[in-house]
Each structure stands twice: as C-alpha cells, then as structure tokens.
C-alpha cells in the first residue's frame, strides 16, 4: 500500500474513533434509579429520567439527599440521560 493510502486509512480511522463515542453514547447508570424526593420538606421542582417512558419527568424534590437521577432542568436531564443511537 502506498504512503498516500496509509495516510488516508489513518485519517479515516482517526475520524471514526472521534465520532464513535458521540453516536453510541449511553446514559449514565444513575439515570436508572427511581426518583428520590429526599428527606427535607422544601418543594423544589426537579426532573428525573424515567426509563420506561424514555423521557425526563418533573417531580417535587424536598431539597436534600438526592440520588444521581435528579436534575435542576429538563434540559440537563435530557443531556445526561437520553441515549444517542
């Protein structure tokens, strides 16, 4: 194989390596946890990822002791938990 062909192959492999994590990204393991309202009694609007619905859902958070499936906004929830095939 010529040096030009090797450079092309190397370039394609590099591009594939860079793009693969974006296209096959999986959600964080905490996204499978049930929503945890916490022990406190504050009424804070929060979002959690609901795997059965494959979307983020609003819930009322008590204000402390949250698990990893707890987000301040729908956008943050979707960024962390939605899969990108």
Curated annotation (Swiss-Prot):
Disulfide bonds join 31-81, 40-64, 56-77. It comes from the Eukaryota. The keyword Amino-acid biosynthesis does not apply. One of its GO terms (cellular component) is extracellular space. GO terms for molecular function: potassium channel regulator activity; serine-type endopeptidase inhibitor activity; toxin activity. Residues 1-24 form the signal peptide. Expressed by the venom gland. Its main location: secreted. Keywords: Disulfide bond, Ion channel impairing toxin, Neurotoxin, Potassium channel impairing toxin, Presynaptic neurotoxin, Secreted, Signal, Toxin, Voltage-gated potassium channel impairing toxin. PANTHER family: BPTI_KUNITZ INHIBITOR DOMAIN-CONTAINING PROTEIN, KUNITZ-TYPE PROTEASE INHIBITOR-RELATED. This is Kunitz-type serine protease inhibitor homolog beta-bungarotoxin BF B1 chain. The lineage of its organism: Eukaryota, Metazoa, Chordata, Craniata, Vertebrata.
